[in-house]
């Protein structure tokens, strides 16, 4: 049995390792060596992900969190049962939850500590593991919540070049780009099923014979959204959502209730590796993890250690629910086949 103190110490050490996107190797090494210290084989794959595979009973479950964080050092400290530090919520708290659920579950589990999630998801796009039956992504949903949908993400670039005229006679490149943005923004709305977004970069300057400008935007896209023709698309990941009647969602509902809480199903307006891995493997995916996502990327990032420890218990129960669901399905199938044989 792994003690609560060991679980807290692992998370503290993981958060202490500064690992912004592109600098994940030290944290990945720590995770691999920690698995090996518990007798679990682990390795670093070709793109830098930390991978551990445990053979056990039930369906194969991929637990995939991310090792990288956004930049910004927050001094790591524990005060009044709360751990402060960059990545404590997004998403080393969920990743540590997955680490211990892997160790404490006698199940078929693939653990993946992914790189570049805060960038262009190189880790998820190049993940080379056996096809899972279910995917759980490590992102803060709150200990009593499970995320069943994320909006998509589209990054596009616009360029304008306008021949010089007298300043009072025409619209320059910057104005054209701003007008283009206002046209796009006019279709924005609120919530999961609406388009939203922001300007990422806007540069405009005068050259010898023209006014030149570039604009990069990022849109959060609802399910079913298709980029307009003619846009220069730098990156596009479609929205993803799972049916709330999925066995995976039902397992979370039961696991959360078993630990004395009322489950909350969430759809988020951000984007995660769930958008990539769910469609890629063609199986149901949700996101789960301790922490308040409103603290993501902020200078106030911190996580309740009691919530973190409880999330491990919830996830272990969820995995047991999934094992039981497969066993029940096999029994029911066997009973049906036996019934057919007797009736024949």
From Swiss-Prot:
InterPro entries the record matches: ArgE/DapE_CS, LysK, Peptidase_M20, Peptidase_M20A, Peptidase_M42
Q: Which GO terms describe its molecular function?
A: cobalt ion binding; hydrolase activity, acting on carbon-nitrogen (but not peptide) bonds, in linear amides; zinc ion binding
Q: Does the keyword Hydrolase apply?
A: yes
Key words of the record: Amino-acid biosynthesis, Arginine biosynthesis, Cobalt, Cytoplasm, Hydrolase, Lysine biosynthesis, Metal-binding, Zinc
> So what does this thing catalyse?
[amino-group carrier protein]-C-terminal-gamma-(L-lysyl)-L-glutamate + H2O = [amino-group carrier protein]-C-terminal-L-glutamate + L-lysine; [amino-group carrier protein]-C-terminal-gamma-(L-ornithyl)-L-glutamate + H2O = [amino-group carrier protein]-C-terminal-L-glutamate + L-ornithine
Q: What class of enzyme is it?
A: hydrolase
Q: What is this protein called?
A: Putative [LysW]-lysine/[LysW]-ornithine hydrolase
Q: Which organism is it from?
A: Thermococcus kodakarensis (strain ATCC BAA-918 / JCM 12380 / KOD1)
Starting at the broadest rank, the lineage of the source organism is:
Archaea, Methanobacteriati, Methanobacteriota, Thermococci, Thermococcales
């Amino acid at each position: 049995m792994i003690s609560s103190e060991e679980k807290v110490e692992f998370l503290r050490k993981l958060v202490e390792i500064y690992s912004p996107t592109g600098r994940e190797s030290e944290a990945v090494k720590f995770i691999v060596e920690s698995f090996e210290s518990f007798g679990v084989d682990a390795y670093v794959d070709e793109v830098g992900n930390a991978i551990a595979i445990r053979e056990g009973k039930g369906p194969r479950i991929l637990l995939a969190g991310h090792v990288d964080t956004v930049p910004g050092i927050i001094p790591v400290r524990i005060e009044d049962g709360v751990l402060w530090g960059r990545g404590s919520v997004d998403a080393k708290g969920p990743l540590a939850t997955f680490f211990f659920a892997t160790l404490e579950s006698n199940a078929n589990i693939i653990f993946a500590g992914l790189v570049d999630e805060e960038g262009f998801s190189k880790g998820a796009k190049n993940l080379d593991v056996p096809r899972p039956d279910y995917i759980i992504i490590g992102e803060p949903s709150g200990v009593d919540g499970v995320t069943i949908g994320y909006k998509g993400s589209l990054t596009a670039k616009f360029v304008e070049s306008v021949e010089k005229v007298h300043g009072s006679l025409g619209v320059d490149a910057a104005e054209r780009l701003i007008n283009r943005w206002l046209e796009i923004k006019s279709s924005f709305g609120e919530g999961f099923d609406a388009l939203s977004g922001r300007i990422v970069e806007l540069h405009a300057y005068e050259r010898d014979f023209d006014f030149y400008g570039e604009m990069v935007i990022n849109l959060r896209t609802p399910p079913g959204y298709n980029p307009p023709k003619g846009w220069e698309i730098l990156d596009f990941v479609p929205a993803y959502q799972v049916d709330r009647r999925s066995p995976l969602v039902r397992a979370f509902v039961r696991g959360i209730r078993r630990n004395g809480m009322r489950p909350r199903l969430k759809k988020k307006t951000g984007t995660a590796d769930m958008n990539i891995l769910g469609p890629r493997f063609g199986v149901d995916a949700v996101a789960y993890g301790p922490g308040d996502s409103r603290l993501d990327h902020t200078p106030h990032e911190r996580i309740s250690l009691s919530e973190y420890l409880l999330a491990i218990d919830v996830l272990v129960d969820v995995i047991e629910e999934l094992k039981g669901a497969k066993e029940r399905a096999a029994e029911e199938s066997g009973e049906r086949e036996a019934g057919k044989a007797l009736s024949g």
